Amino acid sequence: MTFTPGQAEVFTEIEKIGQLTRAMRKAGRPVALVPTMGALHEGHLSLVQAAQQIPGALVVVSIFVNPLQFAEGEDLDAYPRTLDEDVAKLKAAGVDAVFAPSPREMYPNGPRTTIHPGEAGRILEGAHRPTHFAGVLTVVNKLFTITHCDHAFFGEKDYQQLLLIQQIVTDLNMEVQVHGVPIVREADGLAKSSRNVYLSDEERELALTLSAALTAGAFVAEQGPAAVLQTAGSILDAASGIDVDYLELRGTDLSDTPEDGEARLLVAARVGTTRLIDNVGVPLGTGFKGLDDGGEGSAPADNAGE
């Protein structure tokens, strides 16, 4: 197999990407996987940069709009697909390989076997998108197996997803180390998201209410959980045009709200027809500096599956 590292060579077949990653591991190079659905932005590129910090790693970025994680009526068909532009960005970033399979390649027999998240997948996102995490965990498990990865990188914007992936790595004894990477935001605080392209100028301005509410809630962390929720909730309630699915304060492991210590404030809401999620770390009982100065709170610990 002829292969030139750093050129973002595109692989569409499971067999071919597997041949590459097995050969690299045999040669002593670990495999670092960055799973994405494409429509790449600076948040995704921060995952790439984190993966490139693994000494000697072969960095593989997967681009796959996974139909299994979209319910009927969601935005599967509308989800932006920009493969050529994505590959150009990844080549400029020095990524080694891109795995961009078709749905038929990934699910030749349909979704016969799925992984379900258990109780932790029934709250927050799971309460509003009950089939979502089974689709996510199934495709992530497949990508881990296909690429033989040693490391995998996920953004903290999808905080519940990150914890559930850590959960299956632990529970299924996978030999993969999962790394959480902090949220990347626009200069005005909006969390980077591929779905931001759906927003009109007016909706984008309104979407800033989410990060504003989280920041305001976190700033009163020393006053306790009730003050955090009341403050954040009042900002969301005052904004016309935002339909909130949930605003919840939970432990960093998504357990019930602690009285003090590190917690996570999470929100999901529709702005127009676009559903957005965001979250922030909240140091209950202590001060809060803001999103740009240590304000993401404690990240989930990296999870080694060995």
Swiss-Prot record:
GO terms for biological process: pantothenate biosynthetic process. Its EC number is 6.3.2.1. ATP binds at residues 37-44, 155-158, 184, 192-195. Beta-alanine binds at residue 69. The active site is at residue 44. It is an enzyme of class 6 (ligase). (R)-pantoate binds at residues 69, 161. Keywords: ATP-binding, Cytoplasm, Ligase, Nucleotide-binding, Pantothenate biosynthesis. Its main location: cytoplasm. It catalyses: (R)-pantoate + beta-alanine + ATP = (R)-pantothenate + AMP + diphosphate + H(+). Pathway: Cofactor biosynthesis; (R)-pantothenate biosynthesis; (R)-pantothenate from (R)-pantoate and beta-alanine: step 1/1. The reaction proceeds by a bi uni uni bi ping pong mechanism. Catalyzes the condensation of pantoate with beta-alanine in an ATP-dependent reaction via a pantoyl-adenylate intermediate. HAMAP family: PanC. Belongs to the pantothenate synthetase family. Homodimer. This is Pantothenate synthetase. It comes from Corynebacterium jeikeium (strain K411).
